Amino acid sequence: MPRHSRILATGLALLSLIFIRNASAQGRGGPPATLTAGVRGGRDFENHAWSLGGQVGLRLRDRFEIRPSGDYFFGDETPFRWQLNADGAVTFGPSRSIYAGGGAAFVKVRPLDDVKTGYNLFFGLSFAPAQSRSRPFAEFRWTWVNDTSPFRLVVGFSYRLR
């Protein structure tokens, strides 16, 4: 099994165990689903590129959120032009200020003028209580695609719509 596949399988297994444990502790009740939207900007340190994008979050359970997002990359050295993500995230701790997740990545690769698929792993910190309407965050993100895995630091905020 290739190294990247082992990392992905291990990460997904850990997230599944955490989600199952949290879901069983919550019982059948729980808060209603919440919807968030936000903007974010980041820096790809390997390819020396800046990014600007947005994300939407749909919290299905108390600590699990589906989080699609998209980013556009600026710079001539980066092979990436844009990236769409289909991610899920799990929050930790009593204040839900730490989160981790992963998912699929769809990346427009410039030299090939083609869209490649890969996967993401990330973890981050939210700087406001879970019940806050606006939540600033910082995220550490890796995307494996086209035999590369650049590290990105992403900062932004999410605003609760409902």
How would you describe each model-predicted region?
Residues 141-143:
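Flexible, glycine/proline-enriched loop segments at strand-loop-helix junctions
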Residues 149-162:
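Outer-membrane beta-barrel "beta-signal"
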Residues 36, 40, 99-101, 122, ...:
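Short glycine/serine/threonine-biased micro-segments
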Residues 55-139:
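Gram-negative (and chloroplast) outer-membrane scaffold detector with strong preference
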Residues 1-30:
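Cleavable N-terminal export/targeting peptides
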Residues 23-74, 160-162:
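Short glycine/proline- and aromatic-enriched beta-strand/turn motifs that initiate or cap beta-hairpins
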Residues 45-47, 94, 127-131, 146, ...:
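A generic beta-sheet turn/junction motif
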